[in-house]
From Swiss-Prot:
NCBIfam families: EF-G (TIGR00484), PRK12740.1-5 (NF009381), small_GTP (TIGR00231). Keywords: Cytoplasm, Elongation factor, GTP-binding, Nucleotide-binding, Protein biosynthesis. This is Elongation factor G. Pfam families: EF-G_D2, EFG_C, EFG_III, EFG_IV, GTP_EFTU. The lineage of its organism: Bacteria, Pseudomonadati, Pseudomonadota, Alphaproteobacteria, Rickettsiales. Its main location: cytoplasm. It is found in: Cytoplasm. It comes from Ehrlichia canis (strain Jake). Catalyzes the GTP-dependent ribosomal translocation step during translation elongation. During this step, the ribosome changes from the pre-translocational (PRE) to the post-translocational (POST) state as the newly formed A-site-bound peptidyl-tRNA and P-site-bound deacylated tRNA move to the P and E sites, respectively. Catalyzes the coordinated movement of the two tRNA molecules, the mRNA and conformational changes in the ribosome.
Length: 690
């Protein structure tokens, strides 16, 4: 078989959704029906094969993205099952970066939930084509048509409905296939493995024809032949219609919508058909952009197994049997064991030992992998998440991933001297695995501080230290990761001069500091012309600003959302050095503090609360007492859905308070929204200087 024909038979997909929408249950059914496993693992029994960590089995949630491979209709499908909890959103981010397509799973009752919006935006960022699966159609309150409307209202998506549910809630038995215009009914006694086709129920014929017409109108626009047949009133073949839909999905014109109940074993096989029929193969995305290290130009890397080897490392983890495992997605060329490749980011080489295909935490050794493959490499020494591996004679760097800022901190202290050394090793490995986890030592207290995405994230990290590394630690109360920024533009001229008898130090910098929109981070630009400062000294200025902004201006918190433009300066032939310019930059930063209107920022969380009507007044009153603001209220069956924005500082222990207010009947979910200024009247009470 031609190599690129093999590529066309490959699908790299992710399963993504809000927590409890049924991602892992859907994946377990896929593995069962494709013959990858001979039994169905249930999440609620702690037996799901994709949830292999002890914490995942105990909590019934997915924490780490797990990879596996299965086969369907002659196609190989590489699947990554990702977490739905906001605290583990980094796992979704790095998975979507290397996937060609995604299946977005929605709860048929709740529809589009907060984390659904987050993962949808992440998929938009990486232009990942996707299909939607409306799950849990058997549950009380499930409403397929309302969920489709929510795709438009909440996500701005263009849904292309391919199926309609037959029956609702406990009477849900199958679907109407709008492509073939027939019904599909699943047999109860075969665990969903067998099903039969039939006529569309009479009471659904009109609705099926209505949605079939909508489907045709959207799909034929992408193919002249299909459009001509449509306007001539002639029949369009299913194969031509599928080709139109595939084109539209790959171009992100619309998202096909299917439905079912993974737990009740209905709807999964047509979902697999849709993955094969509509989601792109690696070679459907013909080129990816990369930076040519030699020329610093942007070049296109062709997606082909016949090209030079190029891969992106998207995850590092520690395996207790194999040691360090680095997951890579190969975009071009082939990789064989016992060869040497270049890490273009680190400008160092890595020796390739074992190449592994993963099924959750089970491993299969292979000797070669090629473009389109997602594999794990054992024993790499220097490669971390986001690094590019490539052929020795083809140094290129692929676009790196963006990782969210940690919003919560805890102090971690080893319980004994024996735990001290082990804790250092454990934390360095865990931080290497998880780019959304940070660590630093408080210079005043000497405490080790862990930074993470939320209480659950940090709780799981501490639990992993204990289980995997035998480290016992005392944990401090969670603290908010505040930030600082500036509100005014200011130009600073600073001269650093030091004379000590021998060679001295001299550097002069003129820097414009400007505030940037929220979420911009720190930006540095040099506008030096005419040799006012030699090129080799400019990185010292950037380094100095990077270092000092981390220790803050007001209360010791990192400074974000500002730009520093180096526009002039001076140097001395003998006394200037990179260090002198680094110190000058730090001096300029300190001078800027009192002139640029420095303020404190706090993380604001987007919170969705679902509560019975009778508790709504208490819940809203409590939101107001937490300095929160209610943005939206909706009716959902017999409950109220409240969307609010609340400072993270006021959310500690909220789960207990909400249970108490509602007698355990209300629930909530939250995720990071943005940083906002801390009101002046509460700064002194809420912030303690580091």
């Amino acid at each position: 078989m031609n190599i690129d024909n093999e590529l066309s038979k490959c699908r790299n997909i992710g399963i993504m959704a809000h927590i409890d929408a049924g991602k892992t249950t859907t994946t377990e059914r896929i593995l069962f029906y494709t013959g990858k496993q001979n039994r169905i693992g249930e999440v609620h029994e702690g037996a799901a094969s994709m949830d292999w960590m002890e914490q995942e089995k105990e909590r019934g949630i997915t924490i780490t993205s797990a990879a596996t491979t299965c086969f369907w209709n002659g196609h190989r499908i590489n699947i990554i099952d990702t977490p739905g909890h906001v605290d583990f959103t980094i796992e979704v981010e790095r998975s979507l970066r290397v996937l060609d397509g995604a299946v977005a799973v929605f709860d048929g009752v709740a529809g589009v939930e907060p984390q659904s919006e987050t993962v949808w935006r992440q998929a938009d960022k990486y232009n990942v084509p996707r299909i939607c699966f409306m799950n849990k159609m058997d549950r009380m309150g499930a409403d397929f048509y309302r969920c489709v409307d929510m795709l438009v209202d909440r996500l701005g998506a263009t849904p292309l409905v391919l199926q309609l549910p037959i029956g609702s809630e406990k009477d849900f038995v199958g679907v109407v296939d709008l492509l073939e215009m027939r019904s599909i009914i699943w047999d109860e006694d075969s665990l969903g493995a067998s099903f039969h086709y039939g006529e569309i129920p009479k009471d659904m014929i009109d609705k099926a024809q209505e949605y079939r017409n909508k489907l045709l109108e959207s799909a034929v626009e992408l193919n002249d032949e299909a459009m001509n047949l449509y306007f001539e009133g002639k029949e369009i073949s299913v194969s031509l219609l599928k080709s139109c839909i595939r084109t539209g999905v790959i171009q992100s014109k619309f998202v096909p919508v299917l439905c079912g109940s993974a737990f009740k074993n209905r709807g999964v096989q047509p979902l697999l058909d849709a993955v094969v029929d509509f989601l792109p193969a690696p070679n459907d995305i013909p080129v990816i952009e990369a930076l040519d290290v030699k020329t610093s130009n942007t070049i296109n890397v062709k997606t082909s197994a016949g090209g030079k080897f190029v891969a992106l490392a998207f995850k590092v983890m520690t395996d207790k049997f194999v040691g360090s495992l680095t997951f890579i997605r190969i975009y071009s060329g082939k990789l064989s064991s016992k060869t040497t490749v270049l890490n273009a980011v680190k400008d160092s080489t890595e020796s390739i030992g074992r190449i592994l295909l993963m099924h959750a935490n089970n491993r299969e050794d292979i000797t070669e992998a090629q473009a389109g493959d997602i594999v794990a490499l054992a024993g790499l020494k220097k490669t971390v998440t986001g690094d590019t591996l490539c052929a020795l004679d083809y140094p290129v760097i692929l676009e790196r991933m963006e990782f969210p800022e940690p919003v919560m901190e805890i102090a971690v202290e080893p319980k004994s001297t024996a735990d001290q050394e082990k804790m250092g090793i454990a934390l360095s490995r865990l931080v290497a695995e998880d780019p959304s986890l940070g660590m630093y030592v408080n210079p005043e207290s000497g405490q080790t501080i862990l930074k993470g995405m939320g209480e659950l994230h940090l709780e799981v990290i501490v639990d992993r230290m204990r289980r995997e590394f035998n480290v016992e630690a005392n944990i401090g109360a969670p603290q908010v990761a505040y930030r600082e920024t500036i509100t005014k533009s200011v130009e600073i001229e600073y001269i650093h001069k030091k004379q000590t008898g021998g060679a001295g130090q001299f550097a002069k910098v003129n820097i414009l500091f400007e505030p940037l929109p929220p979420g911009s981070g720190f930006q540095f630009e040099s506008k030096i012309t005419g040799g006012a400062i030699p090129k080799e000294y400019i990185p010292g200025v950037q380094s100095g600003l990077e270092n000092i902004r981390g220790s803050g201006m007001l209360a010791g918190f990192p400074v974000i959302d500002f730009k520093a433009t180096l526009f002039d300066g001076a140097f001395h032939e003998v006394d200037s050095s990179p260090l002198a310019f680094e110190l000058a930059a730090k001096g300029a930063f300190r001078d800027m503090v009192n002139k640029a209107g420095a303020i404190l920022l706090e993380p604001i969380m987007k919170v969705e609360i679902i509560t019975p009507d009778e508790y709504m007044g208490d819940v809203i009153g409590d939101i107001n007492s937490r300095r929160g603001r209610v943005a939206e209220m909706q009716d959902r069956h017999n409950t109220k859905v409240i969307l609010a924005f609340i400072p993270l500082a006021k959310m500690f222990g909220y789960v207990k308070d909400l249970r108490s207010m509602s007698q355990g009947r209300a629930q909530y979910s939250m995720y990071f929204s943005c940083y906002e200024q801390v009101p002046d009247n509460i700064v002194a009470n809420e912030i303690k200087t580091k």
